[in-house]
Amino acid sequence: MRRNRSVVALSGGADSATLLYLAATECIDLHALSIDYGQRHIKELECAKILCDGIKVPHTIIKFDLTVFGGSPLTDKSLNVPAQSENKQSSTVVPYRNTILATLCAAYCKQYNLNTIYMGPTHEDLANYEDCRRVFYDSLQQTLRLGGTVHDLVIKVPFIDTEKKDIVHLGYTKLSVPYEKTWTCYEGGDKPCLVCDACRERITSFVLNGLQDPLVPDYDTWKRLEESIIYKD
């Protein structure tokens, strides 16, 4: 059986960064692959590169334009990114993004003689994203084995049953993940918007660990956010 030679599907977000650092402890040969699919939050790719440079992991960015399909505020700037309070998270789905990403990772595995793909769906993702279910990845793994030439290909999804707060706990206490070098916000600004679903989930994960998000350095702002999470009911 081949040793674990892997590629991480890397977005540059907090969960993804933790996945990268976890994979680095398990692999003898590790690469990272990101997609520039026309996302408005392109800053995440800058963070992905910084993360990989920091631990000397080869990083490739593939341009694969998904804006032609429209329908998601992540790729269509004429649409507003919904605040979490609007309960419209399903509108942020980018159709078949994870299928495309996994397929590109499989092709990368063939090129570089790798046999494992790490992807980062989490427990919270299951509510809104059909392509974050375990059955999806089990089926996709079999499809990629049958349709390609890496017949022992494995898709690892170590966080699929893990809550985001526990991912941050792992990254902070065990892996020393530099969360200040990550980007989660769906907006494309210089600072996180603090109201979109991605921001609120990130903030909650830090609050529940008794930590201050390094992307929100202002103490008063953080305390207000913390109280909004703790006393939201």
Please give the residue ranges for each predicted region:
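Short, charged low-complexity linear segments at domain edges
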Residues: 159-186, 224-231
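Local cysteine-cluster metal-coordination motifs and their immediate loop/turn environment
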Residues: 103, 183-204
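ATP-dependent adenylation/nucleotidyltransferase module used to activate substrates
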Residues: 1-175
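Glycine-rich nucleotide phosphate-binding loop and flanking beta-alpha elements
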Residues: 125, 206-207
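Short alpha-helical linear motifs
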Residues: 145, 209-210
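Short Fe-S-cluster ligation motifs
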Residues: 200-202, 206, 212-233
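Charge-dense, low-complexity polyampholytic segments
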Residues: 117, 186-191, 211-219
